[in-house]
Amino acid sequence: MMKFKNKKKKKNSRSYTLKGTVDHVNKKYAFIEIDEFSEDIKIRSRFLKGAIHGDKVEVKVFHHLSRKNLEGEVIKIIERKTTEFIGTIQDSKGFAFFIPKNKKVFVDFFVKKRKSEKFSKNKKYLAKVVDWGNSLKKPEAKIIKCIGNIGENETEINSIIYDFDLPTEFPSEVIKETDLLNERISEKEISKRKDLRSIDTFTIDPDDAKDFDDALSLEKKDNHYLIGIHIADVSHFFNIRTTINKEAEKRATSIYLVDRTIPMLPEKLSNNLCSLKPNVDRLTYSVIIKFDIDFSIIDYWIGRTVIHSKKRFTYDDAQESINNKNGLFHEKLNLLNSIAKKIRDKRFSSGSFNFRSNEIKFKLDKNKKPVEVYKKNRKDTHKMVEEYMLLANKLVAEKIISIEKKEKKTYPFVYRIHEDPEESKVNELKNYIKQFGYTINTNEGNLANSLNGLMKEIKGKPEDRSIEKFAIRSMSKAIYSTKKEKHFGLSFRHYTHFTSPIRRFPDVMVHRLLSDYMNESKPKEKTYYDIMCKHSSKMEINASKAERESIKYKQAEFMSMFIGKKFEAVISGVTEWGVYAEIVETLCEGLIKISSMKDDHYVFDSEKMRITGRNNKKIFRLGQSIRVKVIDTDIEKRTIDLELS
């Protein structure tokens, strides 16, 4: 059998204390996430002792022989995640109550009012906690300011920003330091690098991109090809001791909400100095790969370079040039695309996953209201650029391994790892697809290829999307780590992130470490990189959650125009409280509450992920096509209510 990720064993003692972070699931209970412990601790709300979502706490853990989960109680609140919230106000004479609108905060706050003070129920406010209260006294907050009207774009997006504690403005010290950066590249700096300015280099990015952190080049020689993958040399502009670096460390990633980007770096760096804009010299870190005439890799070189991009393509521009075989660099684009396809085929045959992207995009009007929802169409040019970025990341990781072997030393480094899925998750997937007549091979070395075969088999069938979603949820989460472990999803022995330093701090760390180790520097202290890998992984997850909430908000806003309308839909989730369905035409997901299904009493089957009518025996399961009617939307809660039609 395949080797699955092992769960750590529970401690043997009946009672002990641990430190962790509160994940408040609902009004009844929360889980405490313990970093060094594989199993979360369940805490019933009455034992939280005033702790709320995100707080760091110390808990006393105890075992219930009759219960499956470890349970416990909070004995100390070590650190509050935040003291500020966005919410609404229930106004009364002489006092008011502030109700946070964060979905994971289940406490309201007493507000003292001045005599003339009035609050509107149709507005959202920012409040600061002044007293956390106790068992005898309600917590108290003061109102800082009005954020805006409920349902307006700025109000709702700011709610998401506060809910996920996202950064907004850069500190003045960071801006001052950035303003002092020199835009001119000195001849001395150029002399330290491989000069590639005469080579035809170009970028390929989305239409609305402002920061271009990667470029490609191709040179055809007599019996081989040289492909250059050129990445913005972000680490050249600030060192580890600067305030720019401290802020980038803290942010760790750029965040892409539907209507805005919250960048990791100030605009002068992200959109100007580091951006590989056309017709200007730019400092880069390059991976130059030598291919033979059969498109197999012969050798590669990694080092600091200077380039001069000759053209800024959009993905559409580049695709049109490939399709029509005309325009600037069309021969190079076609050859790059052909080589990328061969690399991709080889990667998939080696066990790399071929999950399809279902990225949702919105067209917004001048007031940032959604007027169209559509699925991002992945063209050959998207896949081509992605393939070269994957290859560069892989080769950089392999370079570090080769340095270690040569020097016979361990060099701490930042890897991107993806663990094997847990056996229980794979078995759940196997049981789920069995009802559709499919199976997968879980023997060691066969799971990835078997999953790719499954994806081909289900393509175009009604259960297609639901099985793919289930399969993705069965996988472990890719993280940053100093451990030299494989990337299961890509089927790479070693992998890192090198190609997006404008928007990811781990890539900045990789550039620095790579440069030091290639210049025969001593191995770095591992502790800092352990801390930063953990922090970067955490911030990546937080950014993803915020991005998803902004999508849900815009979906609810868009569907508010279609209340009473009927649509074809596919069941995308089944729970004990209802059925989630994705509307085919708009890609928006809503909930059909079981309480609204009046024709029978429906029973939830968690193993088969379906509900069944007790009397009529009707079955509703993942992947099933149904017809729904839009009943209501709640823009504030970011939800869509549906009923069967």
Description of each model-found segment:
Residues 10-27, 75-94, 563-577, 628-629:
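Structural detector for short beta-strands of small beta-barrel domains
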Residues 36-51, 102-118, 587-619:
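Beta-strand/loop nucleic-acid-binding surfaces
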Residues 75-94, 145-169, 257:
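Short peripheral tails and domain-boundary helices/loops at the edges of structured domains
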Residues 1-18, 44-53, 58-83, 127-128, ...:
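Short boundary/loop segments of OB/S1/cold-shock single-stranded nucleic-acid-binding domains
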Residues 29, 84-126:
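Structured, charged N-terminal subsegments at the starts of enzyme catalytic cores
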Residues 23-29, 64-65, 79-82, 92-94, ...:
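Short, conserved beta-turn/loop elements at beta-strand boundaries and strand-helix junctions
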Residues 14, 18, 112, 118-121, ...:
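Electropositive polyanion-binding surfaces
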Residues 30-34, 59-61, 97-100, 127-129, ...:
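SH3/SH3-like beta-barrel fold
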